[in-house]
Amino acid sequence: MIDAIYNGGLNLVAASWWTGAAWPVIWNLIKIICVVLPLLGAVAYLTLWERKLLGFMQVRFGPNRVGPFGLLQPIADALKLLTKELIQPAAAAKGLFYLGPVMAIMPALGAWAVIPFGPDLALANVNAGLLLVMAITSIEVYGVIIAGWASNSKYAFLGALRASAQMVSYEIAMGFCFLVVIMVSGSMNLTEIVAVQGRGTMTDMGLGFLSWNWLPLFPIFIVYLISVVAEVNRHPFDVVEGEAEIVAGHMVEYSGMGFAIFFLAEYASMWLVSILAVVMFLGGWLPPFDALGFIPGWIWLGIKTFLVVSMFIWIRATFPRFRYDQIMRLGWKIFIPVTLVWLLVVGAWLLSPWNIWK
């Protein structure tokens, strides 16, 4: 369908040579807009869903004043932040102070270029998609470091130091999780990783969800879920912005749209790591049962991603914040050894007669 639309548009503008030559660029811009605009809307309404779900878990109503059922609350919040003054600290490094939020939001949005929403539905279907996601998202920590240093505030700098140490530490465990998935899939292409999960005895029996990677790679699945919570600095790993000690961490000196961009980066990263979990471990757009195959794949992808994102909020409502030394110990002394052992286990499993990924 996507190819048909592209070819139709190409034929439509072919009459003018310069428009025809520019059509691939125009087409890519259209695809980028079709990904980014819904993503920004999803980020905005994720804030509302978080507040509503936390309210339900804490036996209160949550936002319910702006619009019917509070549905216009994200728009009101966006307008409020847009109209607030962007205050720059007197001793801040001006250029770097404004570069920090940009460095944080760009990787969170840029990594979506290789995320597939269906078998033939991706902005860029590249063979090294998983590697590209890892490379792009690792840049986000530089935005945090720059923001903390450029603010010329001890609280912001301390938050940036914590963030950089925590994100780098858990990136190692997360990278090993990626390696295990690459080993069993035989590819770094995200579309192929989903396709591999659609094969097997259980899929032939109509129980496709038992062929997904979450079951044979369950320890890796759990390590990945916990690692990405730490990677995006979400509760209970949010010592980076621990309200009781360093207020908002690296964002403490930001106001208005500067603060809003950091906020957008955090929630866009939540959607990103959630859809990656679905693609790598939960079958992507594949239905759990063959009987439900009539439902479009992008709907299944959306449902699964929404459930994983809701898990982030559930964790926030359930667990107390960990101490910083506990977070570092978990990453270095538990997760990295566990993932290394599982790399060896899966390697031996793939070479054994009981290889289920053939």
UniProtKB/Swiss-Prot annotation:
UniProt enzyme class: translocase
Reaction(s) catalysed (UniProt annotation): a quinone + NADH + 5 H(+)(in) = a quinol + NAD(+) + 4 H(+)(out)
Protein name: NADH-quinone oxidoreductase subunit H
Taxonomic lineage from the root: Bacteria, Pseudomonadati, Pseudomonadota, Betaproteobacteria, Burkholderiales
Record's bilayer topology term: Multi-pass membrane protein
Taxonomic source organism: Acidovorax sp. (strain JS42)
One Gene Ontology term from the biological process aspect of the record: aerobic respiration
Subunit structure: NDH-1 is composed of 14 different subunits. Subunits NuoA, H, J, K, L, M, N constitute the membrane sector of the complex.
Ranges annotated as spanning the membrane: 29-49, 95-115, 130-150, 176-196, 206-226, 258-280, 297-317, 334-354
Keyword annotations: Cell inner membrane, Cell membrane, Membrane, NAD, Quinone, Translocase, Transmembrane, Transmembrane helix, Ubiquinone
